[in-house]
Amino acid sequence: MIEKKIIADKFNSNFIWIFVDAADKYPKQMNIKANQEHIIYGEKCRLVGFLETESPSTGRFSTNHSTWTHSRPTVSGERFTHSFKTLASRMERLDQTISDRIRIVDGEISRHSDNEKICEQAACTLKTCDNVIVDVKKELEMLHSLRLEDQKKSLMNLIAKVQKSGMIQDLEKWRSLMESRYIFDNTFSSATPHGVLVEMCQCLELMSSMLRSVEQSIADRNHNGVTEKQLHEFKLAFDYFDQEKNGWLDYEHFELCLKSQGYNFSVESTLKETMSLLDPSTYEKHDYMRYMVKHETTNILDDHSAIEDALKNLDARKISDSMSRKEAEFFMSKIAKKAETSSDQVCLEYKDFVNSFY
């Protein structure tokens, strides 16, 4: 009697696999509907068992049904044979891989959530620091209208305010934290901790430079005797040529500003040398003020000596020989204002006349 072994096809309920005997390596596929007498539905469901992960239509069982061989060979021509234990082990590894992937994804979600909070907090700090920088720059623009002593006091207060606020340390902390977490794009702010930190340091350096300049101007003023009125005139001259209100002058306007104060540079190299002493690129107001305070007394004394020397060899008979008619009229009008009349002779103390120009 021929013994038939029947295995149900999980993927197609209309078919089963029939092994006629143990020597039969190639099972026959039978239509259930056409052969109702060979199998009942309950038997099919019982035998489906452990074949839930593989498709019988793509492989063959061994004679003892304990191993499974893929019907499709690999590129090298080999066929893989798997036991049910091997398949179970692969399933365990697959479950472990899925668990690891889920854990990694959860970690990434948590990291992105933390990064978003960091970006939001950093944006608040950046906005605060940016507002402080804007306020400091506005106060610096107003310093030029103050006396030197008031400028010095205001600059010292501004520097202390920025240094004691701890903003530089906060910016360093946020920059280090965001770099360590590879955060290079903040959706809450277009500014970066590094950019704001650089701007803050530049602002501090500018205030320190202005403070040194003001202190030097005070020392030069006290040494040379420049008055507050003269300082005010220097500022007015600078503001007149600084038509764009940038706080600095280019080469051409700086030259005009100095010449308007009585500095006549006959040699071009002399002007360039003077400008290089201030700033090789632009000529800012505090540099200009420092230069004027330092050199104004010398300039006045040189002019004073030149006028005295000219008057020593000048009398009424030589006026027409030494000056044009227009210059002579201007000169005589100055003399008339300071002249002292004694009978029919007009005389003038030339030192008093020279002092009248100042």
UniProtKB/Swiss-Prot annotation:
Domain of life (superkingdom): Eukaryota
InterPro entries documented for this protein: EF-hand-dom_pair, EF_hand_dom
Species name: Caenorhabditis elegans
GO molecular function: calcium ion binding
Name of this chain's protein: Uncharacterized calcium-binding protein C07A9.5
PROSITE patterns, alphabetized: EF_HAND_2 (PS50222)
Keyword Membrane part of the UniProt annotation: no
Keywords tagged on the record: Calcium, Metal-binding
Positions contributing to Ca(2+) binding: 242, 246, 248, 253
EF-hand domain sequence ranges: 229-264
